[in-house]
Amino acid sequence: CRNTIVRYMKCLKKITNMAIAKEWMRKDPFYGYKMEQDETDPVFLTNNELQAIMNREFDIPRLELVKDIFLFACFTGLAFADVSTLRPEHLEQDNNGDWWIRKGRVKLERRRKSSSIANVPLLPVPLAILKKYESHPICLKQGTCLPVVCNQKANSYLKEIADFCGIKKNLTTHAARHTFATTVTLANNVPLQEVSAMLGHASTRMTQHYARVMDRNLKDNMNIVRSKMGL
């Protein structure tokens, strides 16, 4: 599909950029070439699926850890890279005693665009997870808030978690951020502009895609109702 082609072309472009920087190539073969991807719907959990994971306790430590990391992202909207680099200095308490995450997004910082800040009030679920791991040896050694495993391992373990919880979706770390944007916030009538601010989006245009997905899902569900009732 076009998106797969674009993904490979982006990798190739990085290589050619490196070659140009080292003067191995004189001209940019990608000059004037536009990479356009097809819009795809993000994978996210429904409320029932989210509750299924929350209510499941694992005897296997690696699964319990990844479950907690995933739920933390579901209730904060942080990308996996931001969760793994979250440090105590990114946590702030306001005058009312409530805790917030105020953190520049990692992806944008690497591009030297640190103006995009994830600004998220902490709900009881992520607060409890932070408390659970505050004395974890890895956290104490690295100065991080959570002992996050690598993305590849996390995605592998999430597939096991999905199987245990009877979830048929392709569960990855990306699904947590998508779940926050849809099931946790927009589905509970949090204004689009506020969701955009918490996600650290540069504009609400980036967030509107989630709202369109919610509308399509609602329409599909109503079509099922119409079919069952013979309307």
Region spans (language model):
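Active-site/catalytic core of tyrosine-dependent DNA strand-transfer enzymes
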Residues: 121-168
